[in-house]
Amino acid sequence: MSESLQDIALRMVTTGKGILAADESTASIKKRLESIGVESTPESRRDYREMLFRADAMRQSISGVILYDETLRQSAADGTPLRQLIVDAGSLIGIKVDTGTSPLPNFPGETITEGLDGLGKRIAEYHELGARFAKWRGVIAISNGLPTWGAVRSNAHALARYAALCQAGGIVPIVEP
């Protein structure tokens, strides 16, 4: 690997810059676009993302951009891969790798994050496509009697496996509990 995990992590936390979360799912971006009267199509989603990634502020303010799988594979109207726009702006490419949550069996009201199956292969593909960091979201319910130790332990185990797979694949893991 040409760049160490430490080098990537240091670039992510560059003073005065932040990480842009542009990893909204197709359903989430549909709501965002429809709220301003724009139909959600592959083209309108591409145009919205292209506008973000071509903004002058990208170079000055953004150290990395978390993408959704669709975005990582999309190209701008002129054919330039959107991921290249991010790199050209001096930012790192990140990717959301969890696939959402599902109810945690035997733990009413609690969830487990899905996406570990096949993650090693996906990490290798994402690295090949230019991703250098990833995000995994663990959702822990906090209320009267929650979280239970079993749910915390199950989610911590999933987060640890995700982080280990990322590191083995040359990608810095962001752990978002």
How does the language model describe each region?
Residues 109-110, 140-152:
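Surface-exposed cleft-lining segments at the edges of enzyme active sites
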Residues 97, 138, 177:
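Short glycine-centered, acidic/aromatic-flanked micro-motifs in structured strand/loop junctions
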Residues 1-129, 142:
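Alpha/beta catalytic barrel-like cores
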Residues 41, 136, 175:
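Conserved, mostly hydrophobic/aromatic
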Residues 65, 134, 173-174:
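Hydrophobic residues within beta-strands of alpha/beta enzymes
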